[in-house]
Amino acid sequence: MEHPPGSDAETAEASPTRLELIDRAARRLGAADRSAPRRTAEWLLAELLDCDRAHLYAHPDRTVAAAAAEQFHRMVGRRVQGEPLQHILGYASFYGLRLRVSPDVMVPRPETETVVDRALTCIEEVSRPRVLDAGTGSGCIALALKHERPDAEVHACDVSTDALAVARANAQDLGLDVRFFEGDLCAEVPAATPRDVDLLVSNPPYIPDAEAESLPPVVREYDPDRSLFAGRDPLRFYRALVRWVSACCVPGGSFVLEVHAEHAAEVERLFRGEEGVGAVHTEEDLSGRPRIVWGRTERATAS
């Protein structure tokens, strides 16, 4: 007799095979309208069994102990309820790095890798660059830059001590030396902030409060509000970042900022109108949406 997906009778069955678990979980996730249900089931089971997805299908008839199967059903249940896969796994992949995530930080997005790409281009000719990641969250951008440029001196700040704890744990896990400190983008630039950076990079909160209800529940309910929302003024943090760029970047230094697609032109105009800022550009992500505003400060002129 076929039991309803997720029923007590199903979860109580002893020693199911790997393939049976995947099939049942995929049906359960599909019924809940979760994206990529089969792939999600594979990821969860592979994580639980500490193997890769290919290994699951190399031994599809291998049985799974009842206790492990029950744990798997609980993991699937969390995803059915809408919890992000990365929270269930406890980590996210970003720029080839495995990073811890928790409800204290925003899950790193694949599109933010475009920010890292542009940032690396901006400092490719700079020997031993000094970098500042303002609003680091999980540390994903700072750590990716340090991983790709071991010679860089990377500093990173966040207003949240809980987020900084996650970022520091990620740095320790990866063996990467990034200097973290507490700092509020909208307050005075902290004394601990380096004032001679070759690159300032930031992915600040940029979603207007009015758009909150239009966000997918997996974002609205699980990412911290402070990482998402800019309040009534979607340019609030970019106005602050103008001050940070002015205070922290060396002449000829670069800044790379992730932006809301609908406000990219406004952010570009904001920086174009700032004294001491040179060329400013908007760059699209792989989906063709404006994703980055970047530019350079003016080089010092010989007197």
From Swiss-Prot:
Disulfide bonds: none annotated. One of its GO terms (molecular function) is nucleic acid binding. S-adenosyl-L-methionine binds at G135, T136, G137, S138, G139, D158, N203. The keyword Transferase applies. InterPro entries: DNA_methylase_N6_adenine_CS, HemK-like, N5-glutamine_MTase, PrmC_N, RF_methyltr_PrmC, SAM-dependent_MTases_sf, Small_mtfrase_dom. The keyword Cell cycle does not apply. Methylates the class 1 translation termination release factors RF1/PrfA and RF2/PrfB on the glutamine residue of the universally conserved GGQ motif. This is Release factor glutamine methyltransferase.
